[in-house]
Each structure stands twice: as structure tokens, then as C-alpha cells.
Amino acid sequence: MAKQHITTHHSRGRGGRRSARVASLIMATTLLLAGCAGETPSNPEWPTPHFSPDMELPSGSRYVDGNVPAQPAFDTADPWGSIRPDAKPTAARIPSIIERGRLVVGVAQSLNRLGFRAPETSNLAGFEVDIAHEIARDIFGDPNRVEFRYVESRKRDDALHSGDVDIVARTMTITRQRQKSVEFSIPYLHIEDSILTRKGSGIKSVDDLQGKTVCASQDFTPGLLVSVMKPKRILHTQVWTDCLMAMQQDQVDAIYSDDAILSGLQAQDPNTVLVEVGQASGNYGIAMAPPGRAKDGGRDTAGLVRQVNSTLERIKKDGTLSKLYDKWMAEYLGPQRALPQKYRTPEESAKLGRQRAKYFHDVLKPRKAAEAAEASLKSGSGGAGEEDGAADPDDASRVGGASGVGDHRPDSASASTGSTNGGEIYE
């Protein structure tokens, strides 16, 4: 049976953050990073003394009973293609970014080997960070003309819609559901759902997790995990490194996510082993606001997608992507996997535009209005409205309005929780 595309439904639960571990939401402060493209992978090992399961859980973590109804986990529809690069020069594609003089990128800072602070230098490093540098290189001729902002996983879409960042390079799986909210590049990394467990645990597949305790980020709903496995209980943590700590303290038996994220944890503890689940697969892509949907009107969004895709095509052809993969990922994931390169037709763009219009109208706009009303009650100030935009199929997402969309079914779980995301299985 063919594997299905990875997707989950996110909750918007809030909790305290361990400041040394991860930034909350999007930090107001930003980092103009220079010279970190040469960082090399490091495998800082966690201490492995004997622990007791009675020890205090990582901050903000909680157990959830595994006896809950299963929730559909996978988005089975093939994603739409991206926007094909054109022959325009960079200055014509993204004039406002050229004028600003730097690319603003949303990244992680605690996902080892993907986006993290190198312990030796405190510089941001990782596979996704290096890809962002390559995008900046093609725009400015300088890979360091990039400003990194730390983005919490559940706020990635919001960061794009608000214009806080130009692009997000942070473990975002391309799914058709999510394409209603954001625009994606062509893929840069293939992922598979997996389990990380201790060597000698006896866990060889998801069947071995029945009656066990499984850890996952709080972005996973319990129903999703129950649909994949039959755990006795689930430990929800705020960051993935807390799952590793909990497993080292014998508080959980395994960690469930995709193999890219789990390989970063495995690199930190040689006493762990990665077990492929084989039920879902997907591809990471660079995310951008849909044309016409950013706070500033999204005037450069279609051009930015074309620019990013030009870079991804270039680094595939000249071997740069393979070199970056070998540097950061190959040690634990094995040889680089094949990546699709699919671009959509004008007719497909028009159909996607109508789906986006309905999604923004039916799901996102009410959610933002509710958030604005809540903020107004707390601060005593008024809320803000939503901006509109329009152009051709790839230069605005509102073509065709909200009518005539026969295949759009707003995700009920997403709508009820206020999530902007179609979902993924990672932080």
C-alpha cells in the first residue's frame, strides 16, 4: 500500500517556555548572522546517568491518556505544484527585498542538524540554515545578507501572513491542506515517519508500542498518535529535546516524529536507535505567504516563490544540495532520497486560489477576528481588519472569490482549535 502524506491537526495550547531551550513565538529581537555557513555538524551528547521515572517531568510537559478516539492522520491528496521560475531578473522579481538589503527568514534554533545554535560558536547552523544562505547568495551575491528570526512551529503561518518574515525554512511538510494557507517551494528534503527508542528496548515497530508510553511535541493531538499506534499514554512536551530527556529518565519508551527531526536527537545520544514506521512520508518545502495574502499585500510573493525555486533548482543541479545533505543529514538518514519537482498549470493555480479564498474567509478570518477581539478586551484597543489583494492566478490567491469551490472541506479539527495549519508531524 502506498505511503500517505504526513499531516496532523495542531492544537494551540500555550505554556511556559524554558528560555535556554527555545524562543517563544517569534522573538522581537533578530540576528544578523555572518559567517556561519562554514559551521560543521556536532554531536553534543547528553549525560547518561541512571534516572528514575519518578523524577520531575521536563518543564511544561504533561501525560495524556492514550484511551482516546483515533483521529484521521494523513492527507492523502497529492500536493499542488509550486510556481515555475520565469526569466525575469532578481530585481524585477523581488524589488522590495532588494531595496531592504536582506532576506528575513523564519527558522528553528533548537532542532539539531536542521536549525540550531552550534555549541562551539553560538552561531545558527544546520541544513535549513545553510539553504537559507544559498537563497540569499542568489539574491544579493552574498550568502550572509540574511536576517534570521526564531519562529515557533504553531506560528509559522502567522509569521508569513503578518509579513514578519519573507520565508520560513523550518520543517514544513508540503500538503494540499496546508497549501490553502501558505505557498510552498519545490521540495528540498524527503522525510519518513519514525520512532526513536533506546537500544535494547525491544521496540522494532509501532506494534511494539501497544501499552507503552510515547513522547511527542504538544503539536500532536492524542487522537493522531492513537491512529498510528496504541500507546497506554502520551507525554506531550513543548520541545523535542524534552522528549529525549524524558526518554533518558525512563519516563517514556519511545519518541514519534519524522526521521529528520529524530535524527537530530539520535545524534545527541549514541544509546538510541531510529526505527522506521513506514506509514507516512512527505517533503519539506520553503514556505511563503500566498500571493496577495501578506500584510503588505504580498506584492513580491509570487516573484519570491520563483526566486526561491530558482535557487533550489540551482543547488540541485550544481551539487550544493547533495553536499549540504551529506554534511548534515546523511550520517543518520542514509543516501539522499529523490525529490519531486512539480509546477502547477494556470488552471491549477486558479483552482487553488479559489480554495485559498474560501479557507481564508471561512477559517482564518474568523479566527483572527476572535483573537483581535480578545486582545482588544485585554488592552482596551480596537482590532485590525484583513487586507485583500488580487491579480493573475499566481499573483493573488483570491481569484474566483469564495464561490464555486466544490472540493473544499475546511478541516473541522483545525477550525475548532483555531489552527492555521493543515499539519505535520514535527515541532
Which residue stretches match the model-derived regions?
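Extended ligand-binding regions for polar small-molecule ligands
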Residues: 52-88, 220, 286-333, 426
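Extracytoplasmic small-molecule ligand-binding "clamshell" domains
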Residues: 47-168, 408-409
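Acidic, polar ligand-binding/catalytic clefts
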Residues: 133, 137, 144-208
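Short helix-initiation/N-cap motifs at beta->coil->alpha
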Residues: 146-158, 235-249
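Bacterial signal peptide processing site
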Residues: 37-40
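C-terminal motif of bacterial Sec signal peptides marking the signal peptidase cleavage site
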Residues: 32-35
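Periplasmic-binding protein-like
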Residues: 189-197, 263, 267-309, 331-358
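A ligand-binding cleft/hinge motif common to bilobed small-molecule-binding domains
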Residues: 171-180, 248-249, 253-282
